[in-house]
Amino acid sequence: MTDFSPREIVSELDRYIVGQADAKRAVSIALRNRWRRLQLDAGLREEVLPKNILMIGPTGVGKTEIARRLAKLAGAPFLKVEATKFTEVGYVGRDVEQIIRDLVEVAIVQVRERKRKDVAARAQLAAEERVLDALVGANSSAATRDSFRRKLRAGELNDKEIEIETQSSGGGFPMFEIPGMPGAQMGAISIGDIFGKLGGRTKTRRVTVESSHDILIAEESDKLLDNDQLVQEAISVVENNGIVFLDEIDKICVRENRHGGDVSREGVQRDLLPLIEGTTVSTKHGAVKTDHILFIASGAFHIAKPSDLLPELQGRLPIRVELQALTRDDMRRILTEPEASLIKQYVALMKTEGVTLDITDDAIDALADIAVAVNSTVENIGARRLQTVMERVLDEISFTASDRSGETMRVDAAYVQQHIGDLAKNADLSRFIL
């Protein structure tokens, strides 16, 4: 779990996302509160529940990007899902409890990676012995092994091919579901799980010494880990630090004056209620309590309104954050300021062909102006419009770059207008092309 202060979290998000200070503040406080809660004594810790967040804002302003960057920062099990993927319990499709099962799987991978680092040194030695067995045989003399060990560590044998025995990963046993079993979609029931490893099925692989390194270290690390303890730790991490980002929540709103049942809408909202409020979900690894999992929901709400959500669901998302539509200045900053801005990406891509791309300041102004103009006349899709405009402007350069190695291509305002100006002015054409 990260122990960044809210100010540090915001400054980290600022490296990649332009504007939206309110949303950044809200998620940074929520993330810090996770850490604060863990510092409390056990009795009070149980009572402090997370304040779930609802982010409201037009498409393309940074809601999903905030979630993506937060996931990398959090150092906690994090899952981003679209609310539209789920159906009401009892219908064909995924029910919302699958969110928690997926979150547990994410946590298990995270905990395993962390624990592998703790046993890396021992695993490295065991893996080295297995490589030497493959190279010179298990019964070779100590002198021979030492000679090959020195060559191995010096990297002289990296390209040599060897045969290694590795654990067969799944695929050998069919999966089946037990009808009527609650949560039968727990990833189904594997016959391999029921009968154990059946003597540990292995397969022989032919790989180079260099590529065998990671395979064998991972396998030897797993032998040194206690899987049951690892799973219990992962469940504990999910229950205390888990974060779920529910995107497109506005798409499961039931709008006023709509009649008739809708499998993927109100029923999904009703199923989400206990999950967000706090319930116990059965997974194949054990029961998981959701009381302290943080839920961040987001939606554009350009057709539905937040008030169209079930009142109970609104009450379970107490913190509301409104993200602002992007202005021309925001568009300009998005093109230049983030660490991996669009301009930097295109310059780097062209450099691989030996072409130097020189995009002037007035070209950046023109690109921002066109993106804002098209957004206002056609459909406001926010910063995503910049990608469409950039692709259109640089289409000719991208196509011919491989024939222009060593050249410098200058893109100024006149170049931008020449390649896209007329399209942007013609609303009917830009509706289909930009």
UniProtKB/Swiss-Prot annotation:
GO terms for cellular component: HslUV protease complex. The keyword Cytoplasm applies. It is found in: Cytoplasm. GO terms for biological process: protein unfolding; proteolysis involved in protein catabolic process. One of its GO terms (molecular function) is proteasome-activating activity. Keywords: ATP-binding, Chaperone, Cytoplasm, Nucleotide-binding. ATP binds at V18, G60, V61, G62, K63, T64, E65, D247, E312, R384. It holds the Pfam family AAA_2. The keyword Protein transport does not apply. A double ring-shaped homohexamer of HslV is capped on each side by a ring-shaped HslU homohexamer. The assembly of the HslU/HslV complex is dependent on binding of ATP. Belongs to the ClpX chaperone family. HslU subfamily. ATPase subunit of a proteasome-like degradation complex; this subunit has chaperone activity. The binding of ATP and its subsequent hydrolysis by HslU are essential for unfolding of protein substrates subsequently hydrolyzed by HslV. HslU recognizes the N-terminal part of its protein substrates and unfolds these before they are guided to HslV for hydrolysis. NCBIfam families: hslU, PRK05201.1. This is ATP-dependent protease ATPase subunit HslU. It comes from Bradyrhizobium sp. (strain BTAi1 / ATCC BAA-1182). The gene is hslU.
